[in-house]
Amino acid sequence: MIYLVSHNKSLFKTDKYVEATMERAMSVLLPLKLCQLDSETQGLDCHTKDLLTIQLGNRDNQVVIDWTSITKEEKQIVKDYLESDRLFLGWNLMFDLTFLYVQGIYPKHIWDGMIVEQLLYLGYPASMREKSLKAAAWNYLNINIDKTVRGKIINDGLTTEVVIYAAG
């Protein structure tokens, strides 16, 4: 199930995700001790571009948080969750963490699959093994990840397609 936490109301109803309050989202997230972490941003530079969404969850449930629309109090709830003793998993989390640091959020327990992949292939020629999430999904799971939607968030906002991609 995909949950979207946003104060920007959708014009059209969809069966692809559920619009949820922060309280409902936290009821899904709080039981998790191991949680996936990802974000979507306006660009690559955390000092000049904005954090747009934070995605948290597991295989069964994904929560997409519209960072641009939630209240200061809701941001504090997300901060407290991310700074808890949970283990957060992701790919290339160094990128996501820089945007979180600018927001004053400092997760304590991080497991970055890209760093693990780099350590596994340390010393091998770089051309031997690409380190992207797309490459890892193909190498380990034989799954092709379509990243073309990622560029649409800046111009189109949180469309149904973008929410589903972010939760992916």
Segments (PLM) and residue ranges:
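A short acidic-Thr-Gly-centered motif at the start of a beta-strand
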Residues: 20-33, 78-82
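Short alpha-helical segments and helix-capping/turn motifs at coil-helix boundaries
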Residues: 22-23, 37-40, 73-77
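Active-site-proximal helix-loop-helix substrate-binding element of RNase H-like nuclease domains
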Residues: 2-17, 45, 49, 53-168
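Short acidic, Gly/Ser-rich segments with clustered Asp/Glu that frequently serve as metal-coordination loops
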Residues: 34-48
